[in-house]
């Protein structure tokens, strides 16, 4: 058989590729072309390569492209099997005068024909050809060679068919196909557009695995696409807007890509566009905001104008979509606009190194306020049947981001919406699994560092915590939250989240959002302790909360890197103990003693005596563990000292316990070893408050303080109340 005959036989693959979607019954195909059956029989009975080649040629001539239906293709496979194509793909001995790639082309053509059957496309004999098929994409050769072009087309046909099977993307990635596709695209040889299309499909199906296996090659493609995007002057720039989000890496985006992408977006969004042109650009900008925050936007006047333009366009789109009741909402576009609004909120509240100037911030806050009003209007229309929809979740998210920074504006509208928000958060909390699914669906459009994750089933509540923390300070909103049952929900939520930090759980893998959420819950409870003490006394959920705080603090204060959470727990527990002092759980039980011992440890270890060069006397200084977090901690520390002071007369066993811990003695010793000038007046007042209450509550405490030169120390620091107390018998 001649080389030309082999090439002709290779057209069988073409026929398979061009096969019509309609599949006539086999008996109809037979009656229309009875010769085909004889040739298929010859193919099955072929005894050597030459006979198989001849039979394939006869089959090819006997049928037209549209005549090969799925059943016929399957019968050809039954006659040929995989052994023959395998030999064609791997042979290194071609007939004289026949280029070896022609044999491989025939082998690939046969596979392409077989792969049009989904069952065969997932066959192990096809899957194990993935590595060799991938090499054909980057093989060098004459670009005008028809056989080579045919082989490239057939190769893409095979790989695309495999990608369409359930586990196909995983096999392609493992077989090196992603790198081969990247190289084929970057080489811009024949079929490079097919390489890009298949890459897009693989990234959409298995983004993480693709980047893990071929990050350098994918970054090279991103660089090429970004450069093309920056230079594009025709409609291709809008097509690239749709492609580029898929090629943004899960890690750092190269700076040169960011420059090109920002420049291209600035040119697009600065022009007058129709919605089909503008929307992909907004979605690309949202993905960049998600991946990089505002780092992709250059500093200076051009960058600030671009950011202001982004947020303006996003707010206009949100208002147009949500203000008109009954208007069809393009949820993917509006959710992308939410991400850009969140970027605007972050930049407007940033004090240092903000891209925006103050007049721009004022203007954007006003514009965003109107868009948030539209979001509230939309949420007011949401019925129970829509509460599990991802777009509702995204709308609550952007509202939560706004309320975390601004609660004074739109106060009436926010108060009217609070009952819905409490019910919505409760619904998702109680159906944690569904809430987790929702969070994963919208996570890619979030841009804050507290992106929802699988360890946080109560997403909606977490998103609302910062805003509720502000609102519980105000009488009106606080009354609504209490009436709707928010405190009870928050207690349950806190206890559930606390389980994630308990022994037996690996806290090193917890997202920061868990601890931040716990701290924010503590702040809300602190607000309620101060503004609604009656609620703490009468609601049983706070008794359960107190028990959890008492059980948890002893181990928490021993853990490295969790001092801020320990401060919140200690201070909240001390303040609640004053209100619940008559509770049996606080009457010197092991749990209560353990809690107060841990609270004393937290309060007593904040400061140390530190020697200073050239001075005979040490100064009072923060201990190393407290230095880095004191700015966030000091208010809690002073509040904790005040709360402990208030607990001493209410709990008779507390003063003897404090004496056994040697805190009063060590405190006086510390004050006696440092220069009084180094102790700030507010510190003196805090220390005196504790010492005075301990001295008043217990005679043994007074005696121990006198033995520690308490009267002299009180005189040095002008602690008149302590000096007077120690002078009493």
UniProtKB/Swiss-Prot annotation:
Belongs to the neurochondrin family. It is a lipid-anchor. Transmembrane segments: none annotated. GO terms for cellular component: cytosol; dendrite; endosome membrane; neuronal cell body; postsynapse. The modification Asymmetric dimethylarginine is found at residue 75. This is Neurochondrin. One of its GO terms (biological process) is neuron projection development. The modification Phosphoserine is found at residues 2, 448. Probably involved in signal transduction, in the nervous system, via increasing cell surface localization of GRM5 and positively regulating its signaling. Required for the spatial learning process. Acts as a negative regulator of Ca(2+)-calmodulin-dependent protein kinase 2 (CaMK2) phosphorylation. May play a role in modulating melanin-concentrating hormone-mediated functions via its interaction with MCHR1 that interferes with G protein-coupled signal transduction. May be involved in bone metabolism. May also be involved in neurite outgrowth. Keywords: Acetylation, Cell projection, Cytoplasm, Endosome, Lipoprotein, Membrane, Methylation, Palmitate, Phosphoprotein, Synapse. It is found in: Cytoplasm, Cytosol; Endosome membrane; Cell projection, Dendrite; Postsynapse. InterPro entries: ARM-type_fold (IPR016024), Neurochondrin (IPR008709). Palmitoylated. Palmitoylation by ZDHHC1, ZDHHC3 and ZDHHC11 regulates the association of NCDN with endosome membranes. May also be palmitoylated by ZDHHC7. The modification N-acetylserine is found at residue 2. Interacts with MCHR1. Interacts with SEMA4C. Interacts with DIAPH1 (via FH3 domain). Interacts with GRM5. A lipid is attached at residues 3-4 (S-palmitoyl cysteine). It comes from Bos taurus (Bovine). Signal peptide: none annotated.
């Amino acid at each position: 058989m001649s080389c030309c005959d082999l090439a002709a036989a290779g057209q069988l693959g073409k026929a398979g590729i061009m096969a019509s979607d309609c599949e006539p019954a086999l008996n109809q195909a037979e009656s229309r072309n009875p010769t085909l059956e004889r040739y298929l029989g010859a193919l099955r009975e072929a005894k050597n390569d030459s006979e198989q080649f001849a039979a394939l040629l006869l089959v090819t001539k006997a049928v037209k492209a549209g005549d090969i239906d799925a059943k016929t293709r399957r019968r050809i496979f039954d006659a040929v099997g995989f052994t023959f194509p395998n030999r064609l793909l791997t042979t290194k001995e071609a007939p004289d005068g026949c280029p070896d790639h022609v044999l491989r082309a025939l082998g690939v053509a046969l596979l392409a024909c077989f792969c049009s059957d989904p069952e065969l496309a997932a066959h192990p004999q096809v899957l194990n050809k993935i590595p060799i098929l991938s090499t054909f994409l980057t093989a060098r050769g004459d670009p005008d060679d028809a056989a080579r072009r045919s082989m490239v087309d057939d190769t893409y046909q095979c790989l695309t068919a495999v990608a369409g099977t359930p586990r196909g993307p995983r096999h392609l990635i493992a077989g090196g196909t992603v790198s081969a596709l990247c190289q084929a695209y970057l080489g811009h040889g024949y079929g490079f557009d097919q390489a890009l299309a298949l890459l897009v499909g693989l990234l959409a199906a298995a983004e993480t695995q693709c980047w893990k296996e071929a990050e350098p090659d994918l970054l090279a493609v991103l660089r090429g696409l970004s450069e093309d995007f920056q230079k594009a002057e025709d409609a291709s720039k809008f097509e690239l807007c749709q492609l580029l989000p898929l090629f943004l890496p899960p890690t750092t985006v190269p700076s040169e890509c960011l420059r090109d992408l920002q420049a291209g977006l600035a040119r697009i969004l600065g022009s007058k566009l129709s919605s089909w042109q503008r929307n992909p650009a907004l979605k690309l900008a949202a993905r960049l905001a998600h991946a990089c925050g505002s780092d992709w936007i250059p500093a200076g006047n051009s960058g600030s104008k671009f950011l202001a333009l982004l947020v303006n366009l996003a707010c206009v789109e949100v208002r147009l979509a949500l203000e008109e009741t009954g208007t069809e909402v393009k949820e993917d576009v509006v959710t992308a606009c939410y991400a850009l609004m969140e970027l605007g909120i972050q930049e407007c509240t940033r004090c240092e190194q903000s891209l925006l100037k103050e007049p721009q911030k004022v203007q954007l806050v006003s514009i965003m306020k109107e868009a948030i009003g539209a979001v509230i209007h939309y949420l007011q229309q949401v019925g129970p049947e829509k509460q599990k929809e991802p777009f509702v979740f995204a709308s609550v998210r952007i509202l939560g981001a706004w309320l975390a920074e601004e609660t004074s504006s739109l106060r009436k509208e926010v108060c009217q919406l609070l009952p819905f928000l409490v019910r919505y958060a409760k619904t998702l909390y109680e159906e944690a699994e569904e809430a987790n699914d929702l969070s994963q669906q919208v996570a890619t459009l979030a841009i804050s560092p507290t992106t929802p994750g699988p360890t946080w089933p109560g997403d909606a509540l977490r998103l609302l915590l910062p805003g509720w923390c502000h609102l519980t300070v105000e009488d009106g909103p606080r009354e609504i939250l209490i009436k709707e049952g928010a405190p009870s929900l928050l207690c349950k939520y806190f206890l559930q989240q606390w389980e994630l930090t308990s022994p037996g759980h690996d806290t090193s893998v917890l997202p920061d959002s868990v601890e931040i959420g716990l701290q924010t819950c503590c702040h809300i409870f602190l607000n309620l302790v101060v503004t609604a003490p009656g609620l703490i006394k009468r609601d049983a959920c706070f008794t359960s909360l107190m028990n959890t705080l008492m059980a948890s603090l002893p181990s928490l204060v021993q853990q490295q890197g969790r001092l801020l959470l320990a401060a919140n727990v200690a201070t909240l527990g001390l303040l609640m103990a004053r209100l619940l002092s008559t509770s049996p759980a606080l009457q010197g039980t092991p749990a209560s003693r353990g809690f107060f011992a841990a609270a004393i440890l937290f309060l007593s270890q904040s400061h140390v005596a530190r020697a200073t060069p050239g001075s005979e006397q040490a100064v009072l200084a923060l201990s190393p563990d407290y230095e880095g977090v004191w700015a966030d901690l000091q208010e809690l520390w002073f509040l904790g000292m005040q709360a402990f002071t208030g607990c001493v007369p209410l709990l008779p066993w507390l003063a003897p316990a404090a004496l056994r811990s040697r805190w009063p003695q060590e405190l006086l010793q510390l004050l006696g070893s440092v220069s009084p000038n180094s102790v700030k007046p507010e510190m003196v007042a805090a220390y005196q408050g504790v010492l005075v209450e301990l001295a008043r509550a217990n005679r043994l405490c007074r005696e121990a303080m006198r033995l520690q030169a308490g009267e002299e120390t009180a005189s040095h620091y002008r602690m008149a109340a302590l000096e007077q107390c120690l002078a009493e018998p």
